[in-house]
Amino acid sequence: MSNKITILLAVLLAVVACAQAHASHQRRVPYPLPRFLPRPHHTVSNHRIVGGFEIDVAETPYQVSLQRSKRHICGGSVLSGKWILTAAHCTDGSQPASLTVRLGSSRHASGGSVIHVARIVQHPDYDQETIDYDYSLLELESVLTFSNKVQPIALPEQDEAVEDGIMTIVSGWGSTKSAIESNAILRAANVPTVNQDECNQAYHKSEGITERMLCAGYQQGGKDACQGDSGGPLVAEDKLIGVVSWGAGCAQPGYPGVYARVAVVRDWIRETCGV
């Protein structure tokens, strides 16, 4: 009898351990649907910012929609007349010929102009498991024509610090909530940056936050980027400080959004595209 009890307890402990490991792993997931790394065969729905407001693209003229087969999959930011910055998990496994960007429109499905991607330069240290170094540069086939609705965003200096608690704006065509709700209009939300140690504590079960990441959001939740916003801009004081990367759900209390920190790869951006 005692041997049977011992075996039963061992089995129960193994089940609990597996469940905990699964829950921990599920916390670290990138933003495109279906919350796993996108592949060319995936179709990403029109999900958008949680707890935000509709805006005209003229208010965020650096915003682009990254598309595959004429479908919005991620956001991105204009760096120059030829280069876009997005998230590596948005382009991982993709060929340039399969991607286009739409610029100058508040709708990801119409208006503005559509430019083909000529080259993808994914950060060489990108890690699919930890979503570290989540950066990808896209070279466009033709030079952009700037207007009040298409403009490059300024970049921080290499290793420029981001203060805790400063207000930022994140924009995109991602989900307005954690469930599906289609809408093609550009949205934005204002969220404060979060102390690195506090964010590390929130995500300690999923290996924590690296130096290439920064966090923004409210302790009570309610406002955040979500599926479909990945690769899009996090801007503070008219500078691109972050790239929408990953999180635990969308706008969940105690779990701020996690962004790829732009300042730590400023030199790589300059070396790659001369910006």
Swiss-Prot record:
Q: Which SUPFAM superfamilies match?
A: Trypsin-like serine proteases (SSF50494)
Annotated Peptidase S1 domain residues? 49-274
Query: What is the tissue specificity?
Result: Expressed in the midgut. Expression levels drop a few hours after blood feeding and pick up again 28 hours later.
Site positions (Required for specificity) are 224
Q: Which Gene3D superfamilies match?
A: Trypsin-like serine proteases
Q: Where in the cell is it found?
A: Secreted
Which residue ranges make up the pro-region?
19-48
Cite the EC number: 3.4.21.4
Q: Name one GO molecular function term.
A: serine-type endopeptidase activity
Q: What catalytic activity does the UniProt entry give for this protein?
A: Preferential cleavage: Arg-|-Xaa, Lys-|-Xaa
GO biological process annotations for this chain's record? Answer: digestion; proteolysis
| Cystine pairings recorded for this chain | 74-90, 199-215, 226-250
Q: Where is the signal peptide?
A: 1-18
Enzyme category, top tier = hydrolase
One GO cellular-component annotation of the UniProt record comes to: extracellular region
In its keyword annotation, does this UniProt entry include Protein biosynthesis? no
- Spell out the Pfam families in the cross-references: Trypsin (PF00089)
Catalytic positions? 89 (charge relay system), 134 (charge relay system), 230 (charge relay system)
Looking up SMART domains in the UniProt record yields: Tryp_SPc
- Entry-linked InterPro entries: Peptidase_S1, Peptidase_S1_PA, Peptidase_S1_PA_chymotrypsin, Peptidase_S1A, Trypsin_dom, TRYPSIN_HIS, TRYPSIN_SER
Q: Which UniProt keywords apply?
A: Digestion, Disulfide bond, Hydrolase, Protease, Secreted, Serine protease, Signal, Zymogen
Which family does the UniProt entry place this protein in? Belongs to the peptidase S1 family.
Function, as annotated, reads: Constitutive trypsin that is expressed 2 days after emergence, coinciding with host seeking behavior of the female.
Question: In its UniProt entry, what is this protein called?
Answer: Trypsin-4
